[in-house]
Amino acid sequence: MAFTQDLGSLPTTSFISRRVNESTFLVIEDDGYGEQPYIYIKIYKEFLLLTDTGCNNPRSTASSLTSLRQYLETYPVPQNRNQCLNPTGKKAYVVICSHCHYDHILGIPQFLSANTTIIASDFDKAFLLNDLDEHSLCKYVNVATPKYKIARWARHMNYFSLSGTAFRIQFLQTPGHTPDSLAWYDLDEHHLFVGDSFYERKRSKPIPELPDDAGQVPGLPATQAAIIFPEEGGNWIQYMASLDMLLSFVLHRNTELRHQNGLPHGPPPRVKVGCGHLTYEGDAENMIIEVRGLFERIIAGKVPVSGSGKKRGVIHDFWLESEKSKYSVMAPRHLAVEARKHFHGILKH
């Protein structure tokens, strides 16, 4: 049943919601891993389109409503006129997997009984079909790897429709964080969703309900919310190509918006970006340029390593230009070395 009658009797929950735009909501999980994944819910007449499903692991044992699906189907959201996002589960679910890491896929099993359509990138199917327990990092956090089938393999620049409904979204393959990293663009809301390809170190808009320690790496206290690359599939050469592609895409979309909505209508809208953590309505063009510039400086050796540590026997370095910086990076050292060799004499910085 939906909790819409007496708001004072609501159960405690591990989820927090915000409205992103007219059709889309952000749901943040206050999880036991300290990841605080950002889950996006776009509402259609007959469907709910989810970007990722979170950790299915509450931080507080006092929370009584800890299932994402139950939250969507029963819990009133203030920004939705105190109505739940999918009353009684009457709308079908479609899940876009931004990538396969545990903090984004552990909630999938609760949706399988609803005949959910699951979408993932077809850039490197083997990465998803083989050794998912390792590639998802589930084995390293001692949690069972979810079992699910990909119903649609997303091709680069393709659009998506299902059962006669055109979703008006466009897929963008963005390998780098992982081979299966998948972004998508909302044609109507002018919003780009990029998963864990990048995000800010700190929330530009505070979420008072959450502890402010997302993404802390144990043993390296300054690494909070670094843009992280795993040993399992991380690749800076692919990543830089993905940033170039995203920048070209966003520049084109912003040019379109200027032509369609320029003066005398006032400042035109610009493409916004929603990330897998910490950022849900940043300026896409500015953020991509800033992140790309940071990586160019790191690759050029102009940003010193701020700290190092070993994870699973592999040396990881941490880069932070200053405490005022919007971004930081943590990755296996060899990724920077390989990128430095590849881009030698090419990058501007």
Where are the model-predicted features located?
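Eukaryotic N-terminal targeting leaders
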Residues: 1-21, 25, 82-83, 256-263, ...
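Conserved beta-strand hairpin/beta-sheet module of binuclear metal-dependent hydrolase folds
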Residues: 10-83, 184-200
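Divalent metal-coordination and catalytic microenvironments
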Residues: 23, 42, 52, 99, ...
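Metallo-beta-lactamase
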Residues: 48-50, 55-57, 61-64, 159, ...
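Active-site HxH/HxHxD metal-binding segment of metal-dependent hydrolases
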Residues: 57-165, 198-200
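Active-site-proximal loop/helix segment associated with metal-binding centers of metalloenzymes
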Residues: 122-156, 197-227, 288, 296-306
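C-terminal regulatory/interaction regions
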Residues: 297-349
